């Protein structure tokens, strides 16, 4: 990728599949599973990879997001132990999205277009979402292979 015209542009041979819409949400006590696709229209059933986003709270005030595409079963290196308390999440669904809380941290997610906004003690920290038509979470297909 290169940076020109005020935003990142793909080099020749690089295709990206952006996280545009969250199609499905599964809520459990300690985890939230999001399944995102690279298209915005509900009538479309195919046309790109599905990104799996797993949300959990390893410690109070922390919301962990893991993104996967073709998780597979092979063990990846390097590996290291992470201290996880696996705390329950406070999840509140609303029209068009959901809010997830862990202690004083809150994550508000909208489904279409997909966006993620982080708050701490009610103050906005950062957000990830659709900017200038380019999503901030995506998979890349390059001549060297797939990347995320």
How would you name each of these model-derived features?
Residues 1-148:
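N-terminal accessory segment at the very beginning of proteins
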């Amino acid at each position: 990728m290169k940076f020109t015209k005020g935003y990142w542009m793909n080099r020749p041979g690089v295709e990206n599949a952006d996280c545009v819409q969250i199609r499905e949400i599964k809520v459990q006590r300690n985890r939230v599973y999001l399944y995102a696709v690279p298209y915005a229209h509900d009538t479309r059933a195919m046309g790109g990879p599905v990104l799996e986003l797993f949300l959990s709270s390893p410690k109070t005030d922390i919301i962990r997001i893991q993104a996967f595409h073709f998780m597979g079963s092979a063990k990846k290196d390097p590996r290291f132990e992470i201290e996880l308390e696996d705390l329950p999440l406070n999840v509140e669904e609303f029209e068009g999205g959901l809010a997830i809380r862990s202690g004083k941290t809150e994550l508000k997610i909208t489904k279409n277009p997909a966006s993620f906004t982080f708050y701490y003690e009610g103050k906005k920290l950062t957000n990830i979402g659709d900017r200038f038509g380019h999503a901030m979470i995506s998979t890349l297909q390059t001549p060297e292979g797939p990347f995320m």
